[in-house]
Regions:
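Electrostatic, structured charged patches in enzyme active sites and in nucleic-acid/phosphate-binding
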Residues: 1-100
Length: 100
């Protein structure tokens, strides 16, 4: 099982606002010790590329994907922020010890 939150971006919020949302997720992690993935889904790969710059270096694991990559959210479309690894399935972003 993969535990995650998904943020569906419609391109209406500033990139700074997207980054600010991670503060609440970090507070959840600090209060509970539970560290789910936070997945941002973007309307375009261009918006995804821009957002990845402000979503880096956070306390919570963040991954991004975008429309137009072929397979949709269930496919090999997710990029872990802060990693140089290629796009992967969501399940492949979870360390093996955290899978259930």
């Amino acid at each position: 099982m993969v535990e995650f939150f998904i943020e569906v971006d419609r391109g209406t919020e500033t990139l700074a606002r997207l980054a600010d949302k991670l503060t609440g997720y970090a507070e959840l992690v600090n209060a509970t010790g539970w560290t789910p993935l936070v997945c941002f889904w973007f309307p375009t790969t261009g918006r995804e590329t821009e957002a990845r710059q402000v979503l880096a270096h956070r306390e919570v694991p963040v991954t991004t994907g975008a429309n137009g990559l072929g397979d949709g959210p269930g496919g090999v479309v997710w990029l872990q922020v802060g990693s140089t690894a290629p796009r992967r399935h969501l399940i492949d972003l979870v360390p093996a010890g955290r899978r259930s």
